[in-house]
């Protein structure tokens, strides 16, 4: 479906022809995205998309340009030029709710060792910050404290007026790769294979200065941490290059769960073929997470895994969801999931329940959950019985969007305006719900006829 609009599909890569890649026919009855708009403005890889409001988004990438788009029409609204090298991070800094002047700031970091703060409604540069000793790889906003943080070889804290409030000493030549806020005025930073917990100390009557203190280092990962997100207010999750998934307590920073076993010799492949597919560490690298109140969705190598927070186990997986590594995953309404890959495809999945047969226990080799140390065999018996009798799920392919000719880096979902994807082919594609768009066109036509008086004349 949609292959003819662009001119051909993707070529299988690597071991794709040997892998059990799920396919779908041309008649994708459950796929609403039957129309597309191709947006051209960039001259290099487009790596980032960020939503500005209900109808606007910004794109950025290796050409150093930021472009603001209308998600409904695909119209190019603004082009922000200022960086001389590729953009490495982009975030928005919304106005405070108490502030009367509602201007949204866009912050961009670049390999040119600068951060530029932009007015989100104009092309105006509010300020350029060029005091960094290394490339800033991540940015995050602490809305409650009305500050933002930049992470490179050190960690800096800034206010809305762009004053440097405090900073850490040099942390690592590797630099901070990811950064999230956790409770108690703390943030957790991924630095190589380490997690570092920092606490922000705001000014008080006794001290007028801000400070940032290192309070703990978590050394449980065996390889570089590639992904880090909050699960909820009480926990966060990390994933590494060699397929380690760890769930952490966000309050006391202890390990709640650890797993690095992402294959078993079960139905999809025979043992030798499965082992062959998993020989390269890249096949089990955890590239991205997303979550909701019930599940964590993990992009692991070429596969997708759904881990139930309540049942403490994987409830569904597609070990070969794409021909190449899955780079981004997000949850949609109606138990749907979207993934994109280095193979140039975007795929839509539906999480469906299926009752396990009594003789077919739910696999427990994925994400086995334990607290502090191993549980005893006796203590694990009730858990095992519960898993064997529990309802498991499957990920069923319901849509395959073929439009990009190279790696799809990430995407955004707009409830009213469709799906936006960006790619190494320099393009952005706006995927539209065909039925909805047809209805809107008909409505606009009737409104125009009514305004001109032609509707009554025709009747």
Swiss-Prot record:
UniProt function note: Non-catalytic component of the C9orf72-SMCR8 complex, a complex that has guanine nucleotide exchange factor (GEF) activity and regulates autophagy. The C9orf72-SMCR8 complex promotes the exchange of GDP to GTP, converting inactive GDP-bound RAB8A and RAB39B into their active GTP-bound form, thereby promoting autophagosome maturation. As part of the C9orf72-SMCR8 complex, stimulates RAB8A and RAB11A GTPase activity in vitro, however WDR42 is shown not be an essential complex component for this function.
Biological processes, Gene Ontology terms: autophagy; negative regulation of exocytosis; negative regulation of immune response; regulation of autophagy
GO cellular component terms attached to this protein's record: cytoplasm; guanyl-nucleotide exchange factor complex; lysosomal membrane
Source organism phylogeny: Eukaryota, Metazoa, Chordata, Craniata, Vertebrata
Gene source species: Homo sapiens (Human)
Alphabetic keyword roster: Autophagy, Cytoplasm, Repeat, WD repeat
GO function terms (MF aspect): GTPase activator activity
PANTHER family for this protein: WD REPEAT-CONTAINING PROTEIN 41 (PTHR22805:SF2), WDR41-RELATED (PTHR22805)
Effect of residue 445 to R: Reduces interaction with the C9ORF72-SMCR8 complex. No effect on interaction with SMCR8
Keyword Cell inner membrane among record annotations: no
Protein name per Swiss-Prot or TrEMBL: WD repeat-containing protein 41
Intervals holding WD repeats: 40-79, 82-128, 131-168, 220-258, 321-359, 403-441
Name of the gene: WDR41
Cleaved signal peptide residues: none
Domain of life: Eukaryota
Keyword Cytoplasm (UniProt): yes
InterPro entries referenced in this protein's UniProt entry, alphabetically: G-protein_beta_WD-40_rep (IPR020472), WD40/YVTN_repeat-like_dom_sf (IPR015943), WD40_repeat_CS (IPR019775), WD40_repeat_dom_sf (IPR036322), WD40_rpt (IPR001680), WDR41 (IPR040102)
Subunit structure and binding partners: Component of the C9orf72-SMCR8 complex, at least composed of C9orf72, SMCR8 and WDR41. The complex is formed of two protomers, each individually consisting of one molecule each of C9orf72, SMCR8 and WDR41. The protomers homodimerize via an interaction between C9orf72 (via C-terminus) and SMCR8 (via N-terminus). Within each protomer SMCR8 (via DENN domain) acts as a bridging protein between WDR41 (via C-terminus and N-terminus) and C9orf72 (via C-terminus). The C9orf72-SMCR8 complex associates with the ULK1/ATG1 kinase complex.
Effect after changing residue 446 to R: No effect on interaction with SMCR8
Localization in the cell: Cytoplasm
């Amino acid at each position: 479906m949609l292959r003819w609009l662009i001119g051909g599909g993707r070529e299988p890569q690597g071991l794709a022809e040997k892998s059990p890649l799920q396919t779908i026919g041309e008649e994708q009855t459950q796929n609403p995205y039957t129309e597309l708009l191709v947006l051209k403005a960039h001259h290099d890889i487009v790596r980032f998309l960020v939503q500005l409001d209900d109808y606007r988004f910004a794109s950025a990438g290796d050409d150093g340009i930021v472009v603001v788009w209308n998600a409904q029409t695909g119209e190019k609204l603004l082009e922000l030029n200022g960086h001389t090298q590729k953009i490495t991070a982009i975030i928005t800094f919304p106005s405070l709710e108490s502030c009367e002047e509602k201007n949204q700031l866009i912050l961009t970091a670049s390999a040119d060792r600068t951060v530029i703060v932009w007015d989100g409604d104009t092309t105006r540069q509010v300020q350029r910050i060029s005091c960094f000793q290394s490339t800033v790889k991540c940015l995050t906003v602490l809305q409650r404290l009305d500050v933002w943080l930049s992470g490179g070889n050190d960690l800096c804290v800034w206010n809305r007026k762009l004053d440097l409030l405090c900073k850490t000493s040099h942390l690592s030549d590797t630099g901070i790769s990811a950064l999230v806020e956790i409770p108690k005025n703390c943030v957790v930073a991924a630095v190589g294979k380490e997690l570092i917990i920092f606490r922000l100390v705001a000014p008080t009557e006794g001290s007028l200065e801000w400070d940032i203190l290192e309070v703990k280092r978590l050394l449980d990962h065996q390889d570089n941490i590639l992904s880090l997100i909050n699960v909820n207010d009480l926990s966060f999750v990390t994933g590494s290059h060699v397929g380690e998934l760890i769930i952490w307590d966000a309050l006391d920073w202890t390990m709640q769960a650890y797993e690095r076993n992402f294959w078993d010799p079960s139905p999809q492949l025979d043992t030798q073929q499965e082992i062959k597919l998993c020989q390269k560490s890249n096949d089990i690298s955890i590239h991205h997470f997303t979550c909701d109140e019930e599940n964590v969705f993990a992009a692991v190598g070429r596969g997708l895994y759904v881990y139930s927070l309540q049942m403490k186990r994987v409830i569904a997986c597609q070990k070969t969801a794409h021909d190449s590594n899955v780079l981004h995953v997000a949850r949609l309404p109606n138990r749907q999931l979207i993934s994109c890959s280095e193979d140039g495809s975007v795929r839509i999945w539906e999480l469906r329940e299926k009752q396990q047969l009594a003789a077919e226990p739910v696999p427990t080799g994925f994400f086995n959950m334990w607290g502090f140390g191993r549980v005893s065999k006796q203590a694990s018996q009730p858990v095992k019985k519960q898993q064997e009798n529990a309802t498991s799920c499957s990920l069923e392919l319901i849509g395959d969007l073929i439009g990009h000719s190279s790696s799809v880096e990430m995407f955004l979902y707009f409830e009213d305006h469709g799906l936006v994807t960006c790619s190494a082919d320099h393009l952005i594609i706006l995927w539209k719900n065909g039925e909805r768009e047809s209805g809107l066109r008909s409505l606009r036509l009737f409104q125009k006829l009514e305004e001109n008086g032609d509707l009554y004349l025709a009747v």
